[in-house]
């Protein structure tokens, strides 16, 4: 059996009372039936898999434990995590006591998608969109130059509708929203993350005050990208207009651009772009003009980084289940929750519940047969 300290061969005795057979050594060591890898070892493999490619994990295990494993072993650890994630979700739904709802003055929600290369997607579209929502209650200074998000929780799903459901479910079960609560949302206004989506969230939560922001990084990026074929001064003027929240100045920039356009198709594209920017200009309004701090707003790109760093380098391709499982593993590891998933007390409670439900199922089946 391979443990976290190396590979060991040993023999043990089975104990029986005539009705039940048990192996105390296996139980004490936490070994599962027919498995040659300990749970502790699988935990370490899964942890390493969140940081590096599967083949690299094999090399690290070989150099540290002098134990040779294949990438299939790493895959087995990841699939074991997938199984635990599903069990934890069922455990939460059926058994776990609902947490005490926290009363907050400000609740921050941001959403965006991450495009991941997939082996399961259609030939003409080799990317899958991973939905990512982040919920937190503000930003706190923890050192001279570092701030930390408070009560951060991340939701990652390939199914957009399920992600939205999980978002609302998490907020409803963990936060007490009243008339004094301010819902602060931020997005790039892309498909699935428009102001309307977050307004629906606010309506479902029955908040009295909701402030939505069009992520300033994406606004400047869009303006810079669109205006780069025109004189550089126009890009500077547009950036200044956004910074000072001056719609008149921005309209002046657009009027100048319009006068430089000669092609009809280009004009149609420009009118579409101009309409989107001006119609949503109110969401560009800076936080200080809304009597809010900008701390904790616009954090999505930094939250994406841990996912993209592991899953988008060197042209990696992922299966559907692999995208979802690895993304959630990374989130758990960064939040120091991966070990709790493997060894938390919930596993024993869930195991007892599962055994009880199976016993009840067999009893009902036997009763039906007798009837």
Residues covered by each model-derived region:
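Structured, non-catalytic alpha/beta "coupling" segments that mediate domain-domain communication
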Residues: 1-18
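Catalytic center-proximal scaffold of phosphoryl-transfer enzymes
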Residues: 15-371
